[in-house]
């Protein structure tokens, strides 16, 4: 079903429980390695879709020196792109509240960069999804932030959580990309190996 994938030991280098959940849904055997501290800054001339792809390669490069032949490393990074600016993970409760206020009643893009790496080659790609939020009340925003603690999520929200149920008006593109891993696109790339 997945071509020559059985010749690789698949390693998901991620601290994200959502990426682990999505990988498990593919039904492939894989192991998880915790990400070391990786500098997630990026060159100022990058914009939008280029940013998470660049960071996913940086994450892969942090592992490259310890990789063994036969290993296939998967790294990813997700950003929310609103009005030409990156919304990464919020800093604290008030940062999350501010991000959700800025998303309320607007459309934005979610970009996830994915990097596939072996000792012999590296390939990266980006997926994009458009998300439109309904207008959120201050009460809804604060309820969500207090109950769901979205400080580990780009844009301060999980589309699969309460805020997605009540606030997401429309989506164009991959739902799973918004969760943090464009699993259909990843599956297509893995089939090519």
From Swiss-Prot:
Keywords: Cytoplasm, Hydrolase, Nucleotide metabolism. The active site is at residue 77. Its cofactor is a divalent metal cation. It comes from the Bacteria. The keyword Transferase does not apply. NCBIfam families: maf (TIGR00172). This is dTTP/UTP pyrophosphatase.
């Amino acid at each position: 079903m997945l071509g020559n994938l059985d010749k690789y030991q698949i390693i998901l280098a991620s601290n994200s429980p959502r990426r682990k959940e999505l990988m498990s849904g593919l039904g492939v055997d894989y192991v998880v390695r915790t990400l070391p501290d990786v500098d997630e800054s990026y060159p100022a001339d990058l914009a939008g879709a280029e940013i998470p792809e660049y960071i996913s390669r940086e994450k892969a490069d942090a592992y490259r020196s310890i990789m063994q032949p036969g290993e296939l490393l998967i790294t990813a990074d997700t950003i929310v792109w609103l009005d030409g600016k990156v919304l990464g993970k919020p800093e604290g409760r008030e940062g999350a509240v501010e991000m959700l206020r800025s998303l309320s009643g607007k459309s934005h893009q979610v970009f996830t960069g994915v990097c596939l790496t072996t000792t012999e080659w590296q390939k990266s790609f980006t997926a994009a999804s458009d998300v439109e939020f309904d207008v959120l009340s201050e009460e809804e925003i604060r309820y969500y932030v207090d109950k769901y603690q979205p400080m580990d999520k780009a844009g301060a929200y999980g589309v699969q959580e309460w805020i997605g149920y009540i606030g997401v008006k429309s989506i164009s593109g991959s739902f799973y990309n918004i969760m943090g891993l464009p699993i259909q696109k990843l599956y297509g790339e893995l089939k090519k190996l």
